[in-house]
Amino acid sequence: MPFWDTSALVKLYVREHDSDRFVELARRSETRATISQLSIHEMRCVLHRKEFARAIPPNTAELAYREFYNDVQDAVLKLIPYGRDVALEFDRIVRVCYRARPVVPIRALDGLLLASALTARMPDLVSTDLRMRDAGLLLGLRIFPS
């Protein structure tokens, strides 16, 4: 199973116009979805931001977060812990992205998530975030959806 960025992962827990595509991608996989330990915190923020923006119904954020967190606790999702190996890979990723021509202006959290994926030797990335996808391509990951 590919590494799931939060931009795609959230579609498994709240209904969005393209959620079915991501649910099917997860369903077809032979292994568990893999996420970063940091995704746990980002997911809470993303869900509340969507609720605030009225992209999801009121009182949905906490319910969706509980479902997600239960999946983390029950090992439905494979968790990559944050550690020194991820931090060192992050440093390398920042250099690669900002030395590339054209530059890929990666954000800190995206770099940490990509470092988690690469440290865990994940060859594939599921993301809807354009910067994350660009950085993933630069780093040699296969990007889904294509």
Regions found by a protein language model. Give the residues of each.
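Active-site neighborhoods of divalent-metal-dependent phosphate/nucleic-acid chemistry enzymes
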Residues: L77-L130, D134
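A short, N-terminal amphipathic alpha-helix
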Residues: L25-S29, N70-D71, T119
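Poly-acidic low-complexity segments
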Residues: D5, V72, Y82-D85, D129, ...
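Generic secondary-structure boundary/loop-capping signal
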Residues: S7, I35, D74-V76, V103
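A generic local structural motif
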Residues: S19-R21, R66, G111-L114
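Short, well-structured N-terminal submotif of metal-dependent ribonuclease cores
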Residues: M1-L63, L130, L139-F144
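Short flexible/disordered coil segments
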Residues: P2-A8, I93-V104, A135-S146
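Active-site-proximal, substrate-binding regions of enzyme catalytic domains
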Residues: L38-Y98, L138
